[in-house]
Amino acid sequence: MDDDPVQGEDAAMAEVIPLPEGASSGSGRSPATRIILDTVAGSTDEPIVGPAGDAPPTDQVVAVPRLARHEIVLADDHRVGVAVCGQGLPVVLVHGFTAEGILYAQTLSRLVAMGFKVVAIDVAGHGATQGLPTGGDDLESYTRLLARVLDELGIRRAVFAGHSMGGRLVAQLAAADPDRAIAVVLIDAVVGECWDRLIRLSRFAPPVMIGLAALLVADTLSTLPLLRNPSQAAKLGRLVGPVLVGHARRPWRMFGPAISMMRSEPSRRILEDLGEAGIPVVVIHGDRDMPVPYATAVDAARRSAGTLVTVKGGTHSWVLKDPETLPAIIAELLDGPLARVRAAALGAAGLRADAPPTQVERAFLGPHAWVRRLTPPLELRTGAARHHRSRYEWTVSEPA
């Protein structure tokens, strides 16, 4: 592999831990799994929980989620970066092309307060995850790695959320193994007829893909709200900075995922399989997304029989620009379509709708799930709420 191992001070603070004898991860596989606990990456001077809210300071004690970063080593010695926080219904997030899971820390920390256990996984060749041995010649290779990570973490069922390329991966994962998915949330995902046409065109005209990549870079650079909210820009910059440095040091890591997207099969069958399997799908998309046009989402929702959420004025990376909008959308859906999904999942597990997070989590994780070991405790701090209102507005369209 071309990725550097943990070095220097970080390496001195890493620990390799074997699974207990006789224990297995959720599916009974890989008893030899090893976990490197990266205590440096999992701790910062201040939790990144977003901009301070408008409420005045108080003496109220509030729980502050901290997304802990770890590097796990699978049974075949493949290193994978994961970030974990919270307790409750598992939500697995897969990031977009050139990103990594920790960039979504602010949004994920808000989901924790809603009763979710969030797990962000770095895709092969991104973040702390090694590239694939073959260079990742097709997207199925990335999906198979995700499935192995879930098995070895002990996550049996989850809500799968994916942004951009991550949306394609979680859709493909759920379509191939519907029993894993409680629901699928596609966020400006590269699935749908419009995107498929762009991919077909790029095979004959490579500059098309170069243009799409340029649009993605421009959208990412516009993510930092320097003038609108300098404090938020500084916090987000703490997350984005190391990612950009990593790309500058090893730019070749992006070649594999880019080529894999160009070689990917049309997403039509994947979306239709989700609908035929009865997997609840929510398609959330910005109506000003230039790299992945909004028409892509309309087609994806139609083919998967999913709920379409239109983020007004949202560009491709709106979910990074405003950490409040996605949790607000999920909160609204939990009073609507997702309420039925959650109740059905809990009922199938023999739980009541008001079951405590510990029971909910236990129902969807394996008995020796290592993801529990990776989960940090909530911090209790004195102060006011630290959230603004969501920057974007949206509309929700139920399937016909």
PLM segments and residue spans:
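Catalytic histidine-centered segment of alpha/beta-hydrolase-like enzymes
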Residues: 314-327
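Conserved HGGG/HGGXW glycine-rich cap/lid loop of the alpha/beta-hydrolase fold
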Residues: 78-128
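Active-site loop/oxyanion-hole signature of alpha/beta-hydrolase fold enzymes
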Residues: 120-161
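Alpha/beta-hydrolase fold catalytic core
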Residues: 1-91, 113-116, 155-156, 264, ...
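Short beta-strand/loop motif that positions the catalytic acidic residue
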Residues: 277, 283-285
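Acidic catalytic loop of the alpha/beta-hydrolase fold
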Residues: 288-292, 316-317
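Flexible "cap/lid" loop of the alpha/beta hydrolase fold
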Residues: 175, 184-215
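Conserved alpha/beta-hydrolase catalytic His-Asp/Glu region
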Residues: 196-197, 215-276
